[in-house]
Every structure is written in C-alpha cells, then in structure tokens.
Design a protein with these regions (language model features):
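Small/polar-rich, solvent-exposed N-terminal microdomains that initiate assembly or binding
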Residues: 1-69, 142-152, 157-159, 163-164
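Long, contiguous binding/interaction regions
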Residues: 10, 14, 23, 61-69, ...
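Short, intrinsically disordered, mixed-charge
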Residues: 20, 104-115
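Active-site-adjacent structural patch at catalytic or cofactor/ligand-binding sites
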Residues: 53-92
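"Short basic amphipathic alpha-helical interaction patches in structured regions
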Residues: 70-76, 99-107, 121-125
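Short, solvent-exposed beta-strand/turn "edge" segments of beta-rich domains on protein surfaces
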Residues: 74-80, 95-97, 174-178
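Oligomerization/assembly interface segments of phage tail-like spikes and tubes
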Residues: 79-94, 104-105, 181-189
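Acidic-leaning, charged glycine-interspersed low-complexity segments
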Residues: 101, 112-187, 192
C-alpha cells in the first residue's frame, strides 16, 4: 500500500538525484561557487542581487493517470488513486552562465535517469530519517522516512514535457514569479491505494 506521503517522497527522491548528480559532476568548481537544490514554489526563491546558484524543483501540477487506475481495479478491491506528477525544474544564478551550466547538468541527469529504481527510492527514503551534520531532521523529513514508496510495484518514469513558449509563459505568469530558464517533467505513475471499494 502506498501512503499519501508518495507525492513528497517522489519530490525528495528527485531532489536527492539532482543534489548527488551535481556533486558527482563537479558543478561547484565549474560555476565558481556553492550550489544548492530546493523544492519550493518559485516565488519563494530569492532573486536579484542576493540570487545564488541553485536548482529548484517545484511540483506545479498533479493529474489523473486513468490508464494505471483502470488497470488496477478489480471488483471488490479498493480503487487506487493513480497520479502523474508534473515538475518545473528551474536554474538560478548570480553570475554569467551559471544558470545554463546548472540547467545543462540537471537536464543530463534527468535524461540519464528515465526510471526511478526501487533501490534508489529505498536508499533516499531511508536516509531521510538520519541527522545531517548533527542537526535535527525536520518533522516533514522524518515523516517521509516512513513512506513505503520503494515497496510499490509500479515503475516511476521520468518523462520530459516540452512546453512551448506560450505554455511556459502562462505557467510562469500563474506562478507570479520572475521567469528563469526551466524545463518540465512528468513522473508517472504514482499510485495511492484507496479505501473506496470498486
């Protein structure tokens, strides 16, 4: 059974993928400073003179996945909630070319990881419950450590979604944030088991 923590768990796994990939890729030395990865709404990211080199992963939409839902329904069983998660991946930088370098590395990482494998999910979720640098783990991270996402049967596919200029402009206008170089992805399909009988 997959819990309601599935959405946050997928975001945490993607964030971990990006953080580790940037570290392995030596991006810090390429841009001349530290980088970070966040999972915040774009309007909460510092822009302007205080802007820092970072990637942001934002879950901007959740849609129904009717294919998986209909495949899993059997008479008398619980009706699953099958979802596709849509992410906006954005690069920020304070100096020339930082955004392009960060976004290029992120696009490569996502391309090289078309499927979230069970072991990666399990390892990431397990690590969420541990303290980092002797700091107390936030309650949200501690809750995610109890997620059963890794025990699921469905594979989680990372699929690029290529929005046109007009669609991207509408998305950024709706977010009420300053436009930054971005890419969009769909993670399919996340299933939350339901209690409602078919």
């Amino acid at each position: 059974m997959t819990s309601a923590l599935a959405l946050a768990s997928v975001t945490a796994v993607l964030k971990d993928l990006l953080e580790n990939g940037l570290a392995r890729g030596g991006v810090t030395s390429k841009i001349g400073g530290d980088t970070s990865v966040s999972a915040l709404p774009p309007d909460r990211i510092t822009a302007g003179t205080d802007e820092k080199a970072q990637l942001n992963l934002f879950l901007y939409s959740v849609t129904a996945n009717t294919r998986v839902r209909s495949d899993r329904v059997t008479p008398g069983s619980a009706v699953p909630l099958a979802l596709d998660l849509h992410y906006l991946l954005t690069a920020y930088g304070a100096q020339d070319f930082q955004t392009e370098i960060l976004l290029g590395h992120a696009l490569q990482l996502m391309h090289e990881t078309p499927v979230l494998e069970r072991e990666r999910i399990r390892r990431t979720i397990d690590n969420l419950s541990h303290t980092k640098d002797r700091r107390v783990v936030a309650p949200a991270l501690a809750a995610l450590a109890k997620s059963d996402l890794a025990d699921r049967v469905e594979r989680l596919e990372i699929i690029p979604e290529f929005l046109g200029g007009e669609e991207m402009s509408k998305l950024w206008s709706a977010l009420q944030a300053k436009y930054r170089p971005s890419a969009t992805y769909k993670v399919s399909a996340v299933v939350i088991d339901g209690a409602v009988q078919a």
